[in-house]
Design a protein with these regions (language model features):
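Fungal secretory targeting signals
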Residues: 1-19
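Fungal extracellular Ser/Thr-rich, low-complexity intrinsically disordered regions
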Residues: 16-28, 44-46, 50-67, 108, ...
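Beta-propeller and closely related beta-sheet repeat lectin domains
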Residues: 84, 156, 213-218, 245-246, ...
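Beta-propeller domains
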Residues: 189-192, 197-205, 220-261, 284-286, 384-520, ...
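Blade-edge beta-strand/turn elements of extracellular beta-propeller
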Residues: 198-207, 254-263, 305-327, 346, ...
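Immunoglobulin-like IPT/TIG beta-sandwich domains and homologous Ig-like subdomains
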Residues: 226-237, 245-251, 631-707
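Beta-propeller blade signature
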Residues: 244-252, 297-311, 358-373, 412-414, ...
Length: 716
């Protein structure tokens, strides 16, 4: 069946893409310091800001042939040689204005536009116009809101380029329209730093076809992977009624995929697992009745998918939607299962319309009970209100004290859900925006009793604004939120990345995949795909944590996913950066819909390591409690084995570079005997559900860094 390559939509409230409007700042080309432009822009002679064609990858050395720039491994030019020190838009080194001026597309070594124009004669004296600035009445401000100013607005006096009042670096920094704006860049984040190749880089292999665009994904208790998408005008799977399927279940063992049916549009939803192991998909978008009249409005949708490690009859069953609804509509919400098994749901657009308008936004949270049914109240959350319009898909992690770390835009806090209050506001993370539509990635590093389960959180990547010209951020921040003097430790990837996602690996490292070196989230808004795997070792010294892995051949841009499988490999799928599926690349659509899936084999299973897996793993119990209980683990190891880790792993719900609920624990162990082949180890569960909230987990036995096949357990 040939897929349609485009679709003309009629008038509708359903939105294909949220557009973030911002006021482009002017600049001072004579300034030798901060000109006033946004990151990734330069000030030209007429005092306007234009995109700079500059790479945000670490500089590469000059080539002997005088070629340079993005098409030549980001090579730079040597100002001392005969060619010249500027790289032109066409990738040639030179020294003329065609090579060196940013307005002509100079890529690196560019000249700064610091020459001011001559003052013009005038026949009148300067005069100040009558002030027409009106203080805000609703927290919006600036050119798009009648020129209003923030004045003494309770959240802050700076008017951001997006038209909201506040006092964070996102308001008072680059693009600030009025108020006490910073006159110099705020604590600039470090740029890209080259990383050495990993001695065992791993490998990518194309393994099959997802059947539907993989916008959302989760590893289910039956070991299979759920893919969930929005309503489309084409997928590769059909339901029994002849219509397209928008969800699928993939078996990594047999490489088979089967269609799943849902009733409400799950476009850009959130999700989490209930305590009983059921996957819950939350929120979505409106119905597209002209495409599929059988799929209804999903703004308040609640969808349930149940699978079991012991009951194979559940595999292939459709989503269940008994009619439960959220209290308020939510498009782009984030979800976290709490220690008491309730579900915390935060943020989302009410209608997909302009996020610069308060009436379109939902900067609130609501609580669902342990069965995934709303308790019926949406409560305003100040951090989200202040972050507008960068309030959607916030990063959320559960901490050891039962409170939440919540991050959005550039700001974060510790939030007490039970008390509905901010416990502690944390310092802003320097650099660009980190959440939608310039999402980077975030992980909570592996937890253990060695430091009393104290969490450290890493956030990497991001971007400056929602446009294909936006530079991406190479910097990463790492913070221990519960520390008394919590602050960000800065580090850098070897290149800027937007839409990069971090996946915890059983050996304690973090794999970073997917994304782009330029642009933002949205349809057709990114280019220069980042194809290389990056490996982060949190135990290494600062400056030595990053290495580069293997390189994929498949761009993974907007709407891509990555997650760990039971065998310790990583499944990568998706990339659908278009309104409706496009199957072949064209000049207008260089990055079509991607159905091919890949497996990334990490270093610990590469080469000779593949033969070192622990074998014959037996768990004393698969019903575990986070109350300090112990259980025995039997397994066979090589006769030269030196140490073991028992890992408790929750993959969470994956979408838009977020891994909601994702966490990994090292359990305390005893009884391991180095050099013995038949092992019996006692593992101790964490002391409470703050550390391991209830739900499905995978146990990995890891011997000398190599994991055995994982086994699903339920934690209560």
């Amino acid at each position: 069946m040939k897929a349609p390559l485009g679709l003309v939509l009629g008038a509708t409230v359903v939105q294909a893409n949220i557009v973030f409007h911002y006021v482009q700042p002017t600049c001072d080309s004579s300034s030798l310091n901060f000109s006033g432009c946004l990151p990734g822009q330069v000030c030209v002679l007429n005092n306007t800001c234009v995109p700079a064609s500059l790479s945000t990858r670490a500089d590469a050395p000059p080539r002997e042939d005088g070629r340079c720039g993005k098409d030549f491994d980001d090579a730079t030019c040597d100002s001392e040689d005969d060619y010249g020190g500027c790289c032109s838009s066409q990738g040639y080194c030179g020294k003329t204005g065609a090579h060196c001026l940013p307005k002509n597309g100079c890529q690196n070594g560019c000249e700064s536009s610091t020459t001011s124009t001559s003052p013009q004669p005038t026949d009148h004296e300067p005069a100040l116009g009558k002030p027409e600035e009106t203080p805000t009445s609703d927290g919006t401000c600036g050119a798009a809101n009648g020129g209003s100013i923030c004045g003494d607005w309770e959240l802050g006096s700076c008017c951001s380029m997006m038209g909201f009042c506040g006092n964070t670096s996102a308001h008072c920094g680059a693009g600030c329209q009025s108020g006490p704006c910073d006159q110099v860049p705020v604590s600039p984040a470090p740029g890209p730093v080259p990383a050495p190749p990993h001695p065992t880089p791993g490998s990518f292999k194309i393994v099959g076809d997802s059947g539907v665009p993989a916008m959302h994904a989760a590893l289910m208790p039956n070991g299979k992977v759920m893919f969930l998408d929005k309503v489309e005008n084409y997928t590769k799977l059909n339901l029994s009624n002849g219509r397209f399927a928008y969800s699928a279940e993939y078996d990594p063992v047999t490489n088979e995929v089967v269609p799943l049916r849902y009733k409400t549009n799950a476009f850009c939803a959130g999700g989490s697992f209930l305590a009983n192991g059921t996957l819950l998909s939350i929120g979505g978008n409106g119905n597209l009745s002209w495409l599929d009249p059988e799929v209804e409005d999903g703004w308040k949708g609640l969808r349930y998918l149940t699978r079991s490690a012991s009951d194979a009859s559940l595999s292939g069953e459709d989503w269940i939607e008994p009619g439960n609804r959220l209290d308020t509509a939510r498009w782009y919400p984030t979800v976290q299962t709490m220690p008491d098994a309730t579900i915390f749901v935060a943020s989302g657009s009410l209608n997909g319309l302009d996020p610069a308008k308060n009436e379109n936004n939902n900067p609130t949270y609501e609580i669902l009970d342990k069965n995934g049914v709303t308790k019926g109240e949406s409560i305003s959350m100040e951090l989200l209100v202040k972050a507008q319009p960068y309030y959607m898909y916030p990063f959320i992690h559960l901490l050891a004290d039962g409170n939440l770390f919540v991050f959005t835009s550039k700001s974060s806090e510790i939030f007490d859900v039970g008390g509905g209050r901010t416990v502690k506001s944390l310092p802003d993370l320097t650099g660009d925006y980190r959440t939608y539509p310039n999402t980077g990635g975030s992980v909570i590093l592996p937890l253990s009793s060695a430091n009393d389960w104290n969490a450290e959180i890493v956030i990497c990547g991001g971007g400056a604004y929602q446009d294909i010209t936006s530079p991406t951020d190479a910097s990463c921040g790492r913070i221990a939120p519960l520390n008394e003097d919590a602050d960000w430790e800065m580090d850098s990837m070897p290149e800027g990345r937007g839409m990069v996602e971090g996946t915890l690996l059983p050996d304690g490292t973090v794999l970073w995949l997917n994304g782009a070196n330029k642009g933002a989230q949205g349809f057709g808004l990114a280019e220069d795909p980042t194809l290389e795997a990056l490996i982060y070792d949190p135990a290494a010294k600062l400056g030595e944590r990053w290495s580069t892995g293997a390189k994929s051949e498949i761009p993974r841009l907007y709407h891509s996913v990555a997650l760990l499988l039971l065998d310790g490999t990583v499944l990568i799928a998706g990339s659908n950066p278009v309104d409706m599926p496009v199957l072949e690349a064209t000049n207008e659509t260089p990055f079509p819909t991607e159905f091919r899936m890949e497996i990334y084999t990490p270093p610990y299973l590469s080469g000779a390591n593949a033969e070192k897996r622990p074998q014959n793993v037996e768990l004393e119990s698969k019903e575990l409690k986070a109350d300090g209980m112990t259980f025995e683990v039997l397994f066979d190891a090589l006769d030269d084995a030196k140490e073991v880790e028992i890992v408790l792993y929750h993959g969470g719900f994956v979408t838009h570079s977020l891994h909601m609920g994702h966490r990994m624990l090292y359990l305390d162990t005893g009884g391991f005997e180095a050099g013995k082949t038949e092992q019996k180890v006692e593992a101790t569960m964490p002391p409470n559900s703050n550390i391991a909230p209830p739900g499905p987990y995978v146990v990995y036995v890891v011997v000398d860094g190599v994991p055995a096949m994982g086994q699903f357990v339920m934690v209560g």
